[in-house]
Amino acid sequence: METYTFEPQRVCSKRIDFALDEQARLHDVKFLGGCPGNLPAIAKLVEGKDAREVADILRGNPCGSRGTSCADQLSIAIDQALAARSA
């Protein structure tokens, strides 16, 4: 299992930590800062799920006028982690 840390942009959370197993499933998603109800719920919902599917679902989900959201930023983090694994 590989762990990743991502610094999101233009959102309330300051850091996203997560792990990917050998089959590219998400584990141990943690948001530092941000909404204390929604973000732990997202982490529970995505636990053990296919990272590509999660990124596809969360990508483009905005929060207000920010043009992004913590969920959208998680999709970016996943995309970057998967790209790094393939490189």
Predicted region positions:
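Active-site- and interface-proximal helix/loop "cap" or "latch" segments in soluble metabolic
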Residues: 7-86
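Short, hydrophobic/aromatic-rich segments at coil-to-beta transitions
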Residues: 1-5
